[in-house]
Structure formats: C-alpha cells, structure tokens
C-alpha cells in the first residue's frame, strides 16, 4: 500500500482580450512552488491595505507570458510534471485521477484538452499511453484499453458514447465488490490513440447536441473520461497468467465561480436546485478528508454519497488512487475573489492522503466472489419464492449482468464498439452533422452551418452541410434535425440559387433571427451571418463563394464595431467577434425593440453619476475652503500654538485632499464594476425570461414572465458602499387568478432547470405517474411562496452617544424605494459610557485588541476606564404594511459584530383574524427585546456615528389574497395614502404670546387673558394703563404632528404694530385665521398666501399627471389588436385616472382631519389657542430639503404671508432682553407709547377691541438653515384700575385664569414627491426594464425616470438620519441636558475651557447656544457691558480702519458661548447655522446706540472701591460666589477687560427708520454715583449691576433699556429737549455747588424743539419719588435713626428727579447690595396701589402716624416691624412710567397710608 498526498498544481492563464482592453492589473505572482495573490487596489483603503496571500503547492505553472521563456510553462511542461507520473502509476497497477478545477474561462478545458496546435493533458496522456504500450507489449505481456465518457449534469449521468445515452439518464449503484459504478455505461474497446480521439470528438458532439436542445450550459456540467488499462502477464514456463487493472479518470469539473459567492450555493440548495450540488459536496469532501489527514477528525463523516460526482470519485479522493489536481486561475484583479476561492480550495485538497494499492489479478478473484454470491442469491430466492421477493430478484439480475460483462471476450468488446460507432455515425448523419474529425476543416467550395456554443470545447464542433434545398425542423424527415424549445416540425428552408445566392425562408410561427433581427419573409444570407432558430440554436453560415459586397462591408465598418474584420471572418471559420456571446447579445439588443437598451441604462447612470460626482466634489472643495477660512479666523496668531500651527493646517489640508482623491478613485472603480455587473445581469435576465415564456406558452401554463428592476436589499441599508448602482433586475411572475410573485435571477435559473426537464418529459409523453418533476411541484409558479422582503428599516445609532432613548417609527423602505410601512423601535444605552476618544495603551503590544479603553475629558484627564457598552434593541410593532405581504411578518437584523442574525418573531394571537380588505394596512405586534454587550473601539464608535442598524422586515403572502384578473396595482395595497405623503413633508409649531407687567412686588408678571366669544385670537389681554410691559414669545414644535425634521433654533427678532380698534357691535373682529361668520362683513383676516401656493403647485403636478394618463389611455385604446398586457395596462391607467380625480378633489376641498394642508380644523384647541391652523410653505428642494437661495432677511419664508390690515402698517422692533435656556423663548421690552396710538394710551371703551400684530422672526436649523417669519394677532383691553369689588371677585373666583394665547402653524417643506411621479414605482420599473424609449412629457425616458428615482435612496436615508437626529435632540432638550461631544473631533472653538472667547465665532454664531448660561455667572467681568445686543442683518461690520471686518462683531454673541458644550460628531448636521453654514446667513439683531458716550468700565474690576460706611472708608466689592465664577488669572482678567473696552467702543448701526426717535442713554445711570464723595451714612456696597444675560438691543423702538435695571424710556418722564437740558444743567449745578458730586442726570437727546408747557413743568417739579426697598435694606432691618439719610441728599435726589435707590446693608453682612431704578408715582398711582391691596394690613393707622410726620427714624422703625421678603429672586426690579399727560393730580392731603405689601420712602423737598 502506498500512502501519498494529492498532488496539486496551480496554473495561471494569460490575460484575455477583454482584460487587456480594460488594462486590468495582474494580481498573481509565482516564484518556484509558491503562488502569491495580491489584493486588488480597488478593494482596499489607504492605511489598511490587506497583505498578500501566499500559497505553496507541488507545482506552480506560470503561463502568463510566452515571451518569458525562463518562467513560461507550456502544455508540454504540464504533461511532464503531472501526466508522466500518472501514466507511470497506471502501468504499475494503481488507479489514477487528474481533475481540473477553476472558474469558467480560467483555462480548464485548455489544460485538459487543448487544441490542434497545443494538445492538452488528456490527448498527450493517451498518445503517450499507446506509445508505451507499443514499446512494452510482447508475448509475456499484453495490454487492453477501454474507455468510457460520461457527463454529470444536474445530478444526472449521461453516456456520451451511446447514441441513446444523451436522452436518458443512467443510475449510479454501489456494489460491495466493485464499489460505485454507473449502471449501463458504455465501455468501449480502443486499440489506438486515433480511436480515443474519434470517440472523444463524437462524445463532445453528442454533448453539444444535447446541451443545445435543452439549452443547458455545458460550463455547469462535469465531464468524466475514464481509461481502463488491463495488463495480462503470461508465465510461458508454467502457463499461469495474472492481470493488473488500473483506471485513469480524467475529470473536467464545472465552473467554480458560483461556489465562491458566499451563501449562494446554500440558497440555491434551499430552493431545490442541483446546479452546484456536486461542486459544493466536492468541497465538503475535500475539507473532511483534509481534516482527517490533519488529525482533527479521524471519525469525521465524509459525505461521498451527497452527490453523484463525489460518489463516483470516491476511490480517487482519499481512497485507492494516485490523484493529481490542477487548479486554473485568472491573473486579473477583477477575478480576485474567484481566484482566492480556487486557491483555498486547492490548498485544502493538497492535504488529502490517499491509500493506493496495486490492483493485481482482480478478475479471477472478482469472478469467483461474484459466482459465490450468485449461488447464494439463487438459494435465497428459491427459499423465498413463495414470498416473491422483488429485491432479491433485482439483486440477482444485477450480479448476473456483472458476471456477463466481466466474462465478455476482447473480441466481442471490439465488435460491440464498432457497432456503437456505426449507429452513432448514422444518427449524426441523419441530423445533418458532418462526420469529419474537426468540423471547421472542410472544403472551400462547400456551404455549411457551424454551431456556436458558450463552451469553447463545444463551440464550432457541429458542421451541417447545406444542399441546394435544405429543410430545417424537428421532424425526422427534415434534412437538419433540431430539437428543443421553439423548434417547429417544419421550421424553415434554406435555398442555394444557381448564381450562388443563399436565401432563408421561415415558416409561420417559427422563430428565425438573422443577425439578431426577427425575419418573417425570405431573407438573403451572406457569409458570416448569425442565425438563431427557436430559443437557443445559434449557427454561423459559411459561404466561401459568396463574400459580402464591398459596399455592405464598408457600411458595416462604419456602423458596426470597429474591431470587426469581415475579411478575416470570411477566411477564418473561428471569428472571435462572431462567437456565441456576440450572437446572443445581438439577438437580445434587437429583440427588445431598442438599438441598445442596456447601453441606455448605462449611459443614464453614467451621466447622473458624473453629475453627482462633480457636485459632490465641488461641495467638498467649498467645505474645505470654509473650514480653512474658519481656522484662519479663529486661530489668530497670538492664540495659535507657536510650534506647528501653519504646518498642521497645511498637513491637514493635504491629507484631506488625498482622502478626497482616494475616495473619488475608489468610487469610480466601484461604479465601473457595478455598471458592468448590471449590464451582465440585464442580458442574462432577458435571456432567461424569453426561454421561460417559450416553455410556459408551449405547455399552456398561463404564466407570464417579465423583467423588472428593484433595489438590492443590501443597498437599502445605510451601511452600504457608496457609489454602487442601487438597482438590479428581477423577474415578475404573473398567473391569471393568482397574485404576482417576484423572483430573483438565480431563482428563475433554478426553476428553468426543472422547467426543461418537465418540458422534456412532456415532449416524450412520459406518463404522469412516472414524471420525475410532477412530484416536486409546478416549477412555473410557486403555490407556496417563500418569504418576501417587505423592506429595510434603518435605525441610526447616534443616540448611544447620549444617555437618551430613541423611540421612533422607522420607515420601512421597499425594494422600489418607497415607504412600505413603519417599524416602531427603541434603542438605548443600558450601561457603560461612550468615550470622547479611545486611548490606546502604549505599553501593550496589541493595544487595539487589549480592550483598554479610557474616557477622556476635554482637559485630557482620564475619568475612568470602560471596556463594555450594553445596548438594548426593542422592536414593538410594524404598522402600515401592505396586506398582500402581511402573513407571518418577522424581522431579521445583525447587530455590529454578531456572527448570527437575530430574528424577531411576531406575537401571534389566533383569536384575531387577518383582515381581508384589499386596501387595508396591517399592523404586526412584536415583543422583541435584546441586550447586546459590545467592546467600545474606534471601529464601533465610527459605526454608531456613521452607520445604522439595518432591520429587514420579511413577510409571506396572505392565503387567498388573489385577484381574478391580471393585476399590478390591484394586489399591491396602497400603503401611501395622501395622509402618509403629506405627513412626511409637514410639521406643526406653536407660537405662544404672553404680556408681562410690573406687579406690586416689582416683578414682571403675566397679565390675564380673558376669553370672549367675539374674539377668536385666543383671548383679550388685560393691560393696565401706563404700565411698563414686556412681550414674551415662545415657539415650540408639536409632537407627533408630522415627520418633517423641523427644529427652531432661536428667536431673532420680535416686532409689534398694526394697532387697530374694532367695534364689537358694528365690525367683525380681526383674527389670525379664516372665519366663516355669516353675519360678518367682507373683512377676512385669514391669510392664504402660502396655502394658495401649495395648492397651485399640487394642482400643476396633478394636471401634468392627468395629461400623461390621457395620452397613455388614448394610445392604448387606439390599438386595433390588444394583447393581454394592453388590456391590463388600460385598466390600470383608468384606475389611476379615477384616483387622480379623487386627489384633485382633495386639493380643492380637503376633508376635516385628513392631514392635508388647508383642511378644516376638527380639534378642540387648548385654552388660548386659535382653532384654525395657517400654512407656511418653505418651498424646499424635495430631494434633500435644501433651499435654492438664502432664505434670510427680506427673502425669509413667511415674509409675504401678511395678515389683513397689515399691509402698510408700521411695526416697531422690540429689544430682546432675555432668551430662555430651556426652550426657544424670548422676552422683549415693549413701550406702547412708541406707537403714538390713542387706542393704547387711553382706557378701552366697553364695546371696543384693540388688535395688534406680533411678528416674530425665528431661525430654523432644520430642515434647512433659514429664517421664518411668524405672525400672531392679539387682542388687548386697556383699563385704568380695578375696583375693590372687581379685585375681590377675582381673588375668590374659581375660574381658571389664562395668561397666554397662541397660534399653531403647519409648516410645509415641499410638495410630496409621489404626487409628481407620473407612474407608480412598480409600473415604472417594468417600463424601464422593457427599455421603452418613448419619452414622457418632460422629455425623459422611463429608464431615466426610474434610475433618477432609484438613485434618490441615498437622499431618503440622509433625510431619515436627519429626522432621527432631530428626535434625539428633542429628547435631550426634554431632559434639559447639554449635548456633549462624544468623539475626538477637532474643536477649534473651545480653545479654552476656563474663559469666554469672543474671537472664535463667526457672524452666524449669533449667540444662540442650545443652553445659554446665565450672564450673572460672569458678571464680575461683564457688569459694565450694558448689554449684549444683536445687530441688524444688514449692518456693516467695520474695523478700526473703517473697512468691513472679517472677524465677528463683538456684540453679536453672548460672551459665554464658548462654554456651551460641543455636540457629538453626528450632531454636526444638526447645527447648520453654527457649524456648517457659517458666512451664509446673518441672524437678525438690533444694536446698542450711543455707546460712544458710555464711560470707561469701572465696576468690572474686583478691586473697584466705592464709598461705604459713615466714616467714609472704602471697601472692595465682594461678589456672590453662588452667582458668579471667579477669574482664574490676571491674564484672563486683562483679556476680559480688553473685550469690555472693545464692546463699549463699538459703533452701532442705526436703521434709517428709527433714526428720528429720542435716545435714552441708560449707560449713565448709576455710573457717576459710584464715584460720589458724599458721606452717605446708610450706604453700603452696591451690588453689581448686571444680574442676567440679557440681550437688550437697539433703539429700534425709540428708547433704550438699561442692562441692570431693565428700565425703559417709559420708566422716566421724558421732557423735551430745551427744558430737559435746562433742568439737567440746573440740577447739576445745584449738586455741584452743594456737594461737588456728579448728579444722576441722564443724557437725553432732544427729540424736538418743542418746549414744556408751564403745566408740564409744574408736574415735573411736583412729582413724587418713591423708592421700593428690599428685605435686607437698612429700613427693613431697623437701622438706627442716626444712620438715616441726610436731608440734603434727599433734596438733591428730589431735584434731579433721577435718583437711584439705595440698598444699604449692615456692614457685617458681606452680601452685596443691589441698585434699583427710581419709580415716580403720582397721587393717583399711589391710590391705585392702595386699592389693589385692600386686604393687607395698613401700617401707621393704629398708631395714629400721618404721612407728614413720618420721619426717617420712624420710617426705619416702621420698616423693622413690617418687613417683606424679597420676591425678586435677586434680580433688579423696575416699573413702568406714566405718560406725562397723566401727571396732573397733586397731593390732596398730607397723609398717605403705606400698605404692608410694599414699603415706600417719600423723598421730597
């Protein structure tokens, strides 16, 4: 026994012509016995290139370049290395085997067979065999050679040497003596090499005929050529003889490329196909034997019997045989995967160990054993004769047959071989086939047909000579007999005229194509014409005497491919351009009624791809330019690291450019490969469909097959490779009365095999009971269909960066690019944390695998280590599924690095029946919840940042859900209703407005909103006459109101105007919506500007669709002969037309609650909310929701959506003094006197309503960076005072009190895309696959429309990412958490985490952080900055030289924006205004005025000294540690001081329309008092002025608000210019002469030259200064009277009329005091206050103290007994000022009672 391993040789073929033309790179290299496979460049990325793979084999044959003689291995070298060794072993008596393995086209047949000039391994071995026999044969040694030739196709064995063998399959049996064998296989005796050559040639012809008749691809069949060598040894002396029998098996395996595709073989086997079962099993056998040889599984089962091939090769694989394997590979880079698979296959095969023994004298032993077995069987049979055992009888017949074969003499074998050969020749002659050795070597004067076949071994093998009159058909009487699909008994006739002309005349209903064109009449043939008969019989005609005419040659050279050489075609019979592929492609192109439909597809895709690529690269370039510009501006020279600032910029830009270039190259290569694949698939699909339709039609199966297009499931995932074509052909299967099925190309391939077998049995009229495939079901249509992919839902995992749960209804995107329902999922982080960046341990050798991960904060310190992260995935339910696929719906997904897919099964309730309505949408409930523990690596972080969890949703068709007619739409449930369409492009937002007034506690409180039936604005605001007011505006989205990713980022401006008075009796009220009052006048306040625009766009789209449908219906109706497809198409068009009419009605009269914009409201709004919902139309691009222009300023959305009575009205911009941190809300100061409207200055009459319009401009960050103008009409009632009765009633009333009114806006981004599509996606895919070139009304073909639509899947995924990111951000804002950055991306903004940085922000960073910090936290540094206002949109930014500055204006941003936390990487698209779209949109803002008059900053210095105490000593200002952050260093302090100086010295921009207003310079208030040298006995340290982060803006309303007191112009009496100047001068002089102290006079600007009247002057002089005191004031704490305010100070304060309150604390209390603005109150005002507080306890009454007698001492004593808690919350308090005209009353008595609710100090002269 000889134990030897299988010898394995690898041979690499030369590049073929296609690879040379494509300049494909060679990836295979051979050195000695090593083969090196390099990864192709297109499959690798820079920095992660795969290492080359090295394999070692017994032999490596380099056959790439014949010119390299030292390395080149030709056919002779291959034979010497493999053939000679095999032959030697055969002569020694061992069994031997050579099998060739490799993909189709890798050179297997060439290596095994070769051709005439270069013979292959088999001919050389046979030739050497007979040469050696002739040398060694003598008297004592004789040789006998027998051959058999069989083919294994689809697990069936056919005898290629038996004329009848090609029509019937043979059975494989296994005998305990002989082992596996083929029952009935011809074993013919040969005596010479010529006999073998002849038999192989005739066997190949039989193989070709059979394959052509059945349209089988020979590359999928295995050919086994067996040579049995029998040596008989005679001992001349003793007369004994012995035999050695060896069998040499030469196996040409099928193409292996299909096995290399992962999962493909398994899928096909599941579908019941046997195409590659033999190869798959062969791989398993080789693996099992290799494991056995390696000692891994000694008892491992080897599945020999799983396929016919491995069963027959059992001895050759791991048994009694010397085996060699030759693996053929391609050197091209585009065959890398197939080559790698082949090399791995061969690498495992070389480990197999065989146990070969010499088969010496087997015959005698075998015959003896067989005879003993026969006797034994006869005995058993006789004993069991009564039982009539059929098994024993069959076994007996089998053994007797074997004995008979073994005892046949050599002479009888030769005679039998001769008989079979003659019968085979007669059969070929009857079919018209030439019996020449080589079919192409015929006489020059003969006309003949030569076959074309995809297999080079079978191509041009059959030659049919033409007579003068040749008949072609399936009947036995025809000259050329053809069998197969589409061949009629009498198919056509070919006639040769006397002058040499050859013509072809087809018969009726007989398909004949010449050069790809279907011919129906007599057609002249020329030399080289390609002829197709039936479905798959391709021939080329050779007419040596009839060359093409010169003019025809020239014409073809001009129009045809340039490489066609017709002269060569006429002289050489094997013209490469006229091969099988050329002829097949030619037929497909012509049959599809198009010059080149596939080329159309390719051209459209290429065109769109190039446009996308160009725009993407341009956008990339602009983005890098913007980033570089930002870096230059933000990293100013004094702040850059001195080491490598510019170098880093240059390096990063260079690296970025390299990445962009590499990305473009990879994408181009991927796109090119995808185009080639799509072309191949389309050709293949059309070929298969044509054959399937032939078979179905001939067998009357009433089934129709059509090629359609669909998106591959892999491309519906957001993780797919960009650049690949997102479309593939699919097969739509339709049968009358049944539902439509969609098959893949592979599935149809598998079904076709069964169809052919069934067709063959049907043709041979095999009885139904014996039909093999009748038991396996109908291959034409699946009665029990497998599951179908409904769609893929992509869940983006950015929520794992934040500790927030993502609850979202993810759209399920179908393979037509439509939403086929929604999957409700939850994704959350259970445990663990996401690090900002992954830090690798340098000490570890393999840190990336060690799992040592650290969470690093922004300062670089390690917080804690984390290794694991637990994620939870929940699938709740699927809604809106198409009914026809809603039977047993399940989900399947793979999370991150999980090896196996997770399946989520539905919750099945047997009591709930399935809906049977055709248009119903189905809901499936799941209870799936699973936790995943993953290692947090850089790859995982990149995955959750950029990738998605792709959940596939599968379903089965509902039983009985069929239709009685052909259907496309009728079974396709309409899941996209109008509500669904509009829901994706709409979102509602609410705008709430409340008005605040000063209350008795000095706080701004919301005024009441009274409901009234005649007012539909939400209510009437009750405003006190003459009070200071504020307007608070809040904008927030409405949850579950649509899926448009809308996010309001900030309120930019608030303006108010359009004051209108309406009588409740005579006129109808003004509202913010449409009213259908029958008794009103024609006045209508509802704006329909945007709604009309929406309806107009919608109507235009419907009109286009209607015109298209009319045209199509007319076209189909005018056809005289309508096919079934035409009838179906007409019914479908009419159905669409009816649906279009319904949609048209929905445009004009939408049903209430239908979700269509403009639909009547059918809801009960909350109190204060308007009932009807106005529409705002953004008019964005439907593909990516981008704006065509910058929607800012005068171009902002909603600017022109004016309300009635608004046009021409005057609006006043209100200075915004505060933004909310928790929501999008802004508070603006409102002085109603600027309107100069009598309706706002007087008390409103009983039957009158005052209406105003509040106009708010908000900044949207999503769906696009833009500005949006919102309007709300409000109603107001001005009253003077509440009576005691009214006050009492209000306090004891149980009614709910409302304080705000609102309006809900419906924001529409664009018209739904589905509305604009002329055909539904499924029909469009069919029309595109048919390649109908007729254009639509817009000039686009169907294929262009379909590909354009399919390529937008990427846009769908991008929008979905945006929607989910908005959902995450809304969830975060609900939790009121800061969004932190979770990835280590460069953060040039956050240069320092310990100080504010104003220099690093652009113009668009207008100070709208997501969560603003309180200004008071840093008031020590910013208290002298009066306010951080915002600049107007069009204000110029100028530097010191006067030119426009590129750096952002200092006042445009809150100084603490640098402290707002940076968002994670995935939130970049969420902040287009702040991050991505800088320098594009200017936020609207208002400036500070008269800043040049502001004094230098003083109070910001912690060391600032103010007068304190009675002794005149100074003490430093101490700041409250709870409300501020201390400055860490002098450097920061100096920097902030410089910033303050810059802020104060900036020149503001004054809008022209506000230039005439008076200016109140609040910056002077409380400034000069700080430096006063007056000895104030009760004074204490003044508290800092700035206590919040207000954004007080400009003088736009005619006045200026102070930052600390929040007082406005209305807080003081504003005299006219002359008098005020005189008054100011007088008071200044008086103060300076008495105390030499700067007064508190405000610097008024003269508004006019009008002087005060005497009455007004008197009023000013008689006004009363009342100062509210705080809880911790001196009076409240009971300070001794000795520390009271000197009377001279009181006089001074009274004269100036501009005093600030003094909040004096005991010196032991370190809490800083707080300054207050003066409040001037008339007697009337005081009386109102007293009436409002009727329930309080009055002080001083019981003690009999009067107002005049209230001294300083008593006042202090009084305050010590009756003190009030401070309810201002540490904030400054101010109140409104009465109009000067109201100051007409004087004190009527000297005694005024002071209520407990507010203590007052009367300061008068």
UniProtKB/Swiss-Prot annotation:
| Expression (tissue specificity) | Widely expressed, with highest levels in heart, brain and skeletal muscle.
What is the protein's given name? Kinesin-like protein KIF13A
SMART domains for the chain: KISc
Cellular compartment(s): Cytoplasm, Cytoskeleton, Microtubule organizing center, Centrosome; Midbody; Endosome membrane; Golgi apparatus membrane
Q: How does it assemble?
A: Interacts with AP2B1. Interacts with ZFYVE26. Interacts with AP1G1 and AP1G2.
> Transmembrane region positions?
none
Q: Which SUPFAM superfamilies match?
A: P-loop containing nucleoside triphosphate hydrolases, SMAD/FHA domain
InterPro entries from the UniProt entry:
FHA_dom, Kinesin-like, Kinesin-like_KIF1-typ, Kinesin_assoc, Kinesin_motor_CS, Kinesin_motor_dom, Kinesin_motor_dom_sf, P-loop_NTPase
Residues folding into a coiled coil are 359-436, 602-775, 1100-1138, 1518-1547
């Amino acid at each position: 026994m000889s134990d030897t391993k299988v010898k394995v040789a690898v041979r690499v073929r030369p590049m073929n012509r296609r690879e040379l033309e494509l300049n494909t790179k060679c990836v295979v290299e051979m050195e000695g016995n090593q083969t090196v496979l390099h990864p192709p460049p297109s499959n690798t990325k820079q920095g992660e290139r795969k290492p080359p793979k090295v394999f070692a084999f017994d032999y490596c044959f380099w056959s790439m370049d014949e010119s390299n003689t030292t390395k080149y291995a030709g056919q002779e070298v291959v034979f010497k290395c493999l053939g000679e060794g095999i032959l030697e072993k055969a002569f020694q008596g061992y069994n031997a085997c050579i099998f060739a393995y490799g993909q189709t086209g890798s050179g297997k047949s060439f290596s095994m067979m070769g051709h005439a000039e270069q013979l292959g391994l088999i001919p050389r071995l046979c030739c050497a065999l007979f040469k050696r026999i002739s040398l060694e044969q003598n008297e004592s040694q004789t040789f006998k050679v027998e051959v058999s030739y069989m083919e294994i196709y689809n697990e069936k064995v056919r005898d290629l040497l038996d004329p009848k063998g090609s029509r019937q399959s043979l059975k494989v049996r296994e005998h305990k003596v002989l082992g596996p064998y083929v029952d009935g296989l011809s074993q013919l005796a040969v005596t010479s090499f010529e006999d073998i050559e002849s038999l192989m040639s005739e066997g190949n012809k039989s193989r070709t005929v059979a394959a052509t008749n059945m349209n089988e691809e020979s590359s999928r069949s295995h050919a086994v050529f067996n040579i049995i060598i029998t040596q008989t040894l005679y001992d001349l002396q003793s007369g004994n003889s012995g035999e050695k029998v060896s069998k040499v098996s030469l196996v040409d395996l099928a193409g292996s490329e299909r096995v290399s595709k992962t999962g493909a073989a398994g899928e096909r086997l599941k579908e019941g196909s046997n195409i590659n079962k033999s190869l798959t099993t062969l791989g398993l056998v080789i693996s099992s034997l290799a494991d056995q040889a390696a000692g891994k599984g000694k008892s491992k089962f080897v599945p020999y019997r799983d396929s016919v091939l491995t069963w027959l090769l059992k001895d050759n694989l791991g048994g009694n045989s010397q085996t060699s394997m030759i693996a053929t590979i391609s050197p091209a880079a585009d065959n890398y995967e197939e080559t790698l698979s082949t090399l791995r296959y061969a690498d495992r095969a070389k480990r197999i160990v065989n146990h070969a023994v010499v088969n010496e004298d087997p015959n005698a032993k075998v015959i003896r054993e067989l005879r003993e077995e026969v006797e034994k069987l006869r005995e058993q049979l006789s004993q069991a004769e009564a039982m009539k055992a059929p098994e024993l009888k069959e076994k007996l017949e089998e053994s007797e047959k074997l004995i008979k074969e073994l005892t046949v003499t050599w002479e009888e074998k030769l005679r039998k071989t001769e008989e079979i050969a003659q019968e085979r020749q007669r059969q070929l002659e009857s079919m018209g086939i030439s019996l020449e050795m080589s079919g192409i070597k015929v006489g020059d004067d003969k006309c003949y047909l030569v076959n074309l076949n995809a297999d080079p071994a079978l191509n041009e093998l059959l030659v049919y000579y033409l007579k003068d009159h040749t008949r072609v058909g399936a009947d036995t009487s025809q000259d050329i007999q053809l069998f197969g699909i589409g061949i009629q008994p009498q198919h056509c006739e070919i006639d040769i005229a006397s002058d040499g002309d050859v013509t072809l005349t087809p018969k009726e209903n007989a398909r004949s194509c010449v050069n790809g064109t279907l011919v129906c009449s007599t057609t002249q043939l020329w030399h080289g014409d390609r002829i197709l008969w039936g479905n798959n019989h391709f021939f080329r005609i050779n007419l040596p005497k009839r060359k093409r005419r010169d003019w025809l040659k020239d014409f073809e050279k001009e129009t045809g491919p340039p490489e066609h050489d017709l002269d060569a075609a006429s002289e050489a019979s094997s013209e490469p351009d006229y091969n099988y592929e050329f002829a097949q492609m030619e037929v497909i192109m012509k049959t599809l009624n198009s010059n080149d439909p596939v080329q159309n597809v390719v051209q459209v895709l290429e065109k769109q791809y190039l446009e996308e690529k160009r725009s993407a690269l341009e956008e990339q370039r602009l983005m890098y330019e913007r980033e570089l510009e930002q870096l230059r501006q933000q990293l100013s020279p004094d702040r850059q690291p001195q080491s490598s600032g510019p170098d880093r910029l240059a390096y990063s830009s260079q690296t970025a450019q390299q990445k962009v270039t590499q990305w473009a190259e990879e994408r181009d290569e991927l796109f090119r490969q995808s185009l080639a694949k799509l072309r191949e698939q389309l050709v293949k699909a059309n070929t298969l469909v044509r054959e399937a339709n032939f078979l179905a039609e001939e067998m009357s199966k009433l089934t129709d097959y059509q090629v359609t297009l669909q998106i591959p499931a892999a491309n519906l995932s957001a993780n797919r490779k960009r650049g690949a074509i997102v479309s593939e052909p699919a097969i739509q299967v339709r049968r009358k009365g049944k539902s439509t099925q969609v098959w893949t190309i592979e599935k149809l391939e598998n079904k076709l095999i069964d169809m052919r077998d069934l067709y063959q049995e049907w043709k041979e009229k095999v009885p139904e009971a014996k039909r093999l495939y009748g038991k396996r079901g109908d291959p034409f249509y699946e009665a029990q269909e497998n599951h179908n992919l409904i769609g893929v839902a992509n869940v983006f995992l950015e929520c794992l960066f934040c500790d927030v749960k993502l609850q979202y209804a993810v759209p399920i995107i179908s393979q037509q690019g439509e939403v086929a329902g929604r999957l409700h999922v939850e994704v959350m982080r259970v445990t663990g944390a996401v690090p900002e960046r992954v830090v690798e341990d340098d000490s570890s050798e393999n840190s990336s695998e060690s799992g040592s991960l650290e969470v690093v904060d922004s300062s670089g310190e390690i917080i804690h280590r984390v290794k694991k992260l637990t994620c939870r995935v929940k699938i709740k339910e699927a809604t809106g599924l198409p009914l026809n696929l809603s039977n047993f719906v399940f989900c399947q997904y793979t999370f991150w690095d999980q090896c196996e897919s997770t399946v989520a099964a539905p919750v099945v309730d047997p009591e709930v029946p399935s809906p049977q309505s055709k248009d119903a949408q189905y809901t499936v409930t799941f209870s799936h919840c699973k936790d995943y523990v993953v290692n947090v690596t850089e790859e995982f972080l990149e995955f959750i940042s950029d990738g998605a969890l792709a959940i596939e949703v599968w379903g089965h068709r509902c039983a009985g859900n069929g239709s009685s007619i052909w259907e496309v739409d009728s079974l396709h449930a309409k899941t996209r209703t109008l509500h669904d369409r509009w829901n994706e492009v709409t979102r509602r937002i609410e705008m709430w407005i409340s008005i605040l007034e000063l209350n008795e506690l000095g706080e701004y409180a919301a005024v009441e909103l009274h409901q009234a039936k005649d007012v539909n604005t939400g209510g009437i605001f009750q405003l006190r006459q003459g009070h200071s007011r504020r307007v608070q505006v809040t904008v927030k989205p409405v949850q579950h109101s649509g899926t448009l990713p809308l996010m309001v980022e900030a309120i930019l401006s608030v303006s108010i105007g359009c004051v209108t008075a309406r009588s409740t009796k005579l006129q109808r009220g003004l509202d913010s919506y449409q009213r259908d009052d029958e008794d009103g006048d024609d006045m209508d306040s509802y704006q329909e500007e945007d709604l009309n625009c929406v309806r107009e766009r919608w109507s235009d789209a419907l009109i286009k669709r209607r015109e298209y449908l009319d045209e199509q219906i007319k076209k189909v109706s005018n056809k005289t002969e309508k096919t079934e497809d035409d009838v179906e198409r007409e019914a479908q068009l009419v159905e669409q037309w009816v649906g279009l009419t319904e949609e048209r009605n929905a445009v004009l009269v939408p049903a209430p609650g239908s979700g269509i914009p403009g639909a009547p409201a059918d809801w009960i709004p909350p109190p204060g909310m308007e009932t009807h919902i106005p529409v705002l139309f953004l008019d964005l691009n439907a593909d990516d929701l981008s704006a065509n222009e910058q929607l800012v300023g005068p171009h902002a959305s909603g600017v022109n959506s004016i309300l009635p009575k608004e046009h021409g009205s005057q609006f006043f911009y209100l200075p915004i003094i505060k933004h909310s941190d928790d929501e999008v809300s802004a508070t603006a100061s409102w002085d109603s006197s600027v309107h100069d409207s009598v309706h706002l200055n007087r008390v409103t009459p009983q039957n009158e309503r005052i209406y105003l319009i509040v106009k708010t401009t908000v900044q949207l960050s999503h769906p696009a960076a833009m500005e949006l103008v919102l309007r709300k009409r409000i109603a107001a009632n001005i009253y003077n005072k509440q009576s005691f009765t009214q006050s009492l009633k209000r306090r004891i009333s149980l009614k709910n009190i409302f304080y705000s009114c609102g309006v809900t806006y419906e924001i529409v981004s664009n018209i739904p895309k589905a509305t604009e599509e002329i055909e539904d996606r499924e029909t469009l895919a069919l029309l595109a696959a048919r390649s109908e070139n007729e254009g639509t009304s817009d000039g686009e073909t169907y294929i262009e429309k379909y590909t354009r639509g399919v390529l937008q899947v990427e846009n769908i995924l991008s929008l979905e990412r945006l929607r989910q990111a908005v959902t995450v951000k809304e969830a975060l804002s609900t939790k009121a958490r800061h969004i932190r950055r979770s990835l280590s991306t460069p953060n040039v903004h956050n240069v320092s985490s310990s100080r504010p940085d104003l220099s690093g922000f652009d113009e668009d960073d207008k100070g709208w952080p997501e969560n603003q910090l309180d200004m008071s936290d840093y008031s020590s540094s910013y208290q002298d900055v009066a306010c951080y206002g915002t600049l107007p949109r069009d204000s110029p930014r100028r530097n010191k030289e006067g030119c426009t500055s590129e750096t952002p204006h200092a006042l445009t941003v809150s100084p603490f924006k640098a402290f707002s936390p940076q968002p994670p990487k995935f939130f970049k698209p969420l902040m287009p205004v702040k991050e991505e779209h800088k320098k594009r949109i200017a936020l609207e803002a208002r400036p500070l005025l008269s800043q040049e008059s502001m004094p230098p900053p003083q109070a910001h210095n912690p060391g600032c000294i103010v007068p304190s105490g009675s002794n005149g000593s100074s003490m430093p200002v101490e700041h409250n540690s709870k409300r501020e952050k201390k400055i860490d260093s002098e450097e920061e302090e100096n920097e902030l001081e410089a910033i303050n100086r810059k802020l104060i010295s900036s020149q503001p921009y004054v809008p022209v329309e506000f230039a005439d207003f008076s200016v109140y310079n609040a910056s002077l208030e409380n400034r000069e008092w700080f430096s006063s040298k007056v000895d104030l006995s009760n004074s204490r340290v003044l508290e800092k002025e700035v206590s919040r982060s207000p954004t007080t803006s400009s003088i736009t309303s005619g006045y200026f608000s102070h930052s600390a007191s929040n007082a406005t112009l209305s807080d003081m009496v504003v005299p006219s210019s002359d008098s005020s100047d005189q008054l100011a001068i007088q008071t200044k002089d008086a103060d300076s002469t008495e105390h030499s102290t700067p007064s508190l006079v405000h610097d008024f600007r003269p508004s006019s030259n009008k002087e005060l009247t005497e009455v007004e002057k008197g009023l000013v002089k008689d006004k009363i200064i009342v100062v509210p005191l705080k809880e911790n004031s001196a009076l409240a704490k009971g300070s001794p009277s000795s520390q009271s305010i000197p009377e001279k100070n009181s006089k001074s304060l009274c004269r100036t009329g501009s005093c600030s309150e003094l909040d004096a604390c005991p010196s032991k209390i370190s809490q800083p005091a707080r300054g207050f603005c003066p409040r001037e109150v008339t007697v009337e005002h005081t009386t109102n206050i007293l009436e409002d507080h009727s329930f309080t306890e009055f002080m001083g009454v019981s003690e009999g103290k009067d107002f005049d007698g209230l001294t300083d001492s008593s006042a202090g004593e009084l305050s010590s007994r009756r003190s009030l808690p401070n309810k201002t919350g540490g904030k400054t308090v101010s109140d409104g000022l009465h109009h000067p005209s109201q100051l007409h009353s004087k004190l009527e008595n000297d005694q005024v009672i002071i209520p407990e609710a507010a203590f007052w100090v009367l300061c008068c002269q």
